[in-house]
Design a protein with these regions (language model features):
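N-terminal pre-catalytic "stem/leader" segment of glycosyltransferase-like enzymes
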Residues: 21-22, 173-233, 240-247, 357-358
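Segments forming glycine/polar-rich beta-alpha architectures that bind adenosine-containing cofactors
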Residues: 1-3, 7, 30-31, 208-275, ...
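Catalytic donor nucleotide-activated moiety binding site of glycosyltransferases and closely related
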Residues: 39-81, 375-417
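A donor-sugar binding/catalytic signature common to diverse glycosyltransferases
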Residues: 83-128, 238-248, 256, 261, ...
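Leloir-type glycosyltransferase catalytic cores
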Residues: 1-9, 26, 128-198, 202, ...
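Histidine-anchored nucleotide/phosphate-binding helix
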Residues: 15, 28-45, 208-211, 245, ...
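Short acidic-hydrophobic, aromatic-tinged amphipathic segments that line or gate anion-handling sites
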Residues: 77-83, 135, 218-222, 413-418, ...
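Short loop/turn segments at strand-loop or loop-helix junctions that form parts
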Residues: 10-22, 55-56, 119, 261-262, ...
Length: 547
């Protein structure tokens, strides 16, 4: 929070209120009279200053009473009766007065002078001006002076125990800070009222947990007239590249448009089988598979400075993904397919099919269009290689279109179904794709990748590109690519867990699920349909109404 501009040369002083009956006041030698003396001292010691009182959040919410009423205050005193970030407020102050409030220590961390009228844990170490009658005795008991770092380490790291917000296990302060920082950042990105437009019941059910807006409503349609009457701070959420006209009109009005898509480590099953996503990309600038404009991901890859710690995180994540065989859908048997004798001594090329009406194929593969064309282009360029074709899991499941024509099947030396992507990648020397995420997963495993379209990972010097990408001029290492694409870009959530988690949390959850499923049989068609019906029924109950 930012206070009104101060008069040049006029200092600002903060007096921190607390709630009546607070145990820290009782144990810290403070009373209601303490707060009267505190405000009097602030006024007397700073006759030319602005005096501000910070009201406690429990007082603002009506749950507790404080020690200051507006009508009792001197005309020089201003009551700050609204929520604010303590550190942002303290940064604007020149002196801070407290009884026993923790804000006194936070002021010390910012290098502010602090006067203590009570006996908080951070008093008596030579860092505060202590005016309590027992202050001298307290300092004698402390026995030595300490600096702010000493106090921070003792109180925040050595003394306090932490629980990981995601796993519920013992954790470090750094785990908790990472979680808090992530959730604060996402919360600040999307506080405006949000309309989810044109989404199915299931899609709304999966999307809403990934939005941080205080108010989320669903609309079947949003007419130009209604769009023109929406407040300027409204956010529009769209799935993928649908409703292009609405997206253009909303952005022309200056509204925020969030285009949402599956993340790159999605789930333990297919989206078309109604497995809820564990990650989604929420992009205010476009979609990562459409090269016509620079998505937030492309901008991050182009400009984000990746320091050695970031790259190290990318390397560790890459190694964990490969070691546990984690990919987008985590399907199929991990048994490595057998190559016939005819393949021995030949270069092994894995061609990855896609769902042919998928938006990434429509937008990002305008030169080679469709699985038949991809297989033909690969065979034409590699007549002597052993070519293996693997279709998309959604196509294999019968949920989406993209089967090869019989005339194209003869171009492949081997067609593999059932086996997991990771198992197939073990065999390959090269992987050829249009825009498939499988190309990215092949890069993680050290494979040579040929791209005939414009996936997010092409154009950075890591792939052989058959599609022009002149906007992407930066050269990246694989670990830099992994850090930006997996650690920074998507949002992650786990079932039944509050808040947004890290990609590492999701990978660990998937690895545990995968180990638990070892030896389990595949679901029958009937079981899949029953589970899908259950997911859909819950979606209707939770999100079944348009406004």
């Amino acid at each position: 929070m930012h206070l009104p501009p101060s008069t040049p040369g006029k200092p600002r002083v903060l007096v921190v209120d607390q709630t009546e009956g607070d145990l820290s006041l009782l144990r810290g030698g403070a009373s209601a009279d303490t707060f009267a003396r505190m405000i009097a001292a602030a006024l007397a010691e700073h006759p030319d200053a602005e005096i501000w009182i910070k009201t406690h959040p429990d007082v603002l919410s009506g749950r507790r009473r404080g020690h200051y009423e507006r009508w009792q205050l001197d005309s020089r005193v201003r009551l700050l009766a609204q929520e604010c970030c303590p550190l942002s407020l303290l940064a604007q102050m020149d002196h801070v007065y407290v009884a026993t409030s923790q804000m006194g220590f936070e002021a010390l961390m910012l290098g502010k002078p602090v006067t203590c009228f009570g006996l908080p844990w951070y008093a008596g170490w030579g860092l505060t001006h202590d005016v309590h009658p027992e202050a001298a005795r307290l300092a004698l008991r402390r026995g030595r002076q300490r600096n702010v770092v000493d106090l921070f380490v003792a109180a925040y790291i050595q003394y306090t125990r932490y629980i990981h917000p995601v796993t519920g296990q013992s954790a470090s302060i750094f785990d908790v800070i990472d979680w808090l920082a992530r959730n604060k950042a996402i919360g600040q990105e999307g506080r405006a009222p949000t309309y989810c437009v044109g989404m199915s019941l299931w899609k709304r059910a999966t999307v809403m947990p990934f939005l941080s807006a205080s108010t989320i409503r669903s609309l079947r349609h949003l007419s130009p007239d209604k769009l023109s009457r929406l407040p300027q701070d409204t956010t529009i959420a769209i799935w993928g590249d649908r409703h292009a006209g609405l997206i253009a009109r909303a952005r022309a009005r200056g509204l925020t448009v969030l285009q949402m898509e599956d993340g790159f480590v999605r789930s333990a099953g297919l989206g078309s089988d109604l497995h809820a996503p564990l990650s989604l990309a929420v992009d205010p600038d476009g979609v990562h598979y459409d090269p016509k404009s620079a998505s937030k991901l492309e901008q991050l890859l182009s400009t984000r400075t990746v320091n050695p710690d970031d790259a190290g995180r990318g390397r560790r994540l890459r190694e964990t993904l490969v070691r546990n065989g984690i990919d987008k859908y985590n399907l199929g048997h991990s048994t490595i397919p057998v190559l016939p004798a005819q393949a021995l001594g030949k270069r092994i090329i894995l061609v990855i099919g896609q769902v042919e009406d998928d938006a990434s194929v429509r937008n990002g593969s305008t030169l080679v269009k469709g699985n038949d064309a991809l297989l033909a282009a690969t065979r034409r360029a590699n007549p002597d290689a052993w070519v293996i074709y693997k279709s998309h899991p959604d196509v294999e499941a019968g949920n989406r279109i993209g089967s090869l024509k019989p005339a194209s099947e003869i171009l492949a030396d081997q067609i593999i179904t059932e086996a997991s992507l990771g198992a197939c990648l073990v065999l390959a020397d090269e992987v050829h794709v249009m825009t498939s995420l499988s190309g990215f997963e092949a890069l993680l495993r050290g494979k040579a990748v040929h791209c005939y379209g414009a996936p997010f990972y092409a154009g950075w010097g890591l792939t052989t590109d058959h599609f022009p990408l002149p906007r992407r001029q930066r050269r990246l290492t694989l670990d830099e690519l992994v850090f930006v694409a997996l650690c920074l870009y998507p949002r992650y959530r786990l079932p039944g867990v509050e808040g947004f988690c890290s990609v590492e949390d999701v990978v660990d959850w998937l690895a545990r699920r995968k180990r638990a499923r070892l030896g389990a049989t595949s679901e029958s068609w009937l079981v899949r349909q029953g589970r899908k019906a259950g997911h859909l029924a819950r979606s209707v109950l939770q999100h079944g109404r348009y406004v």
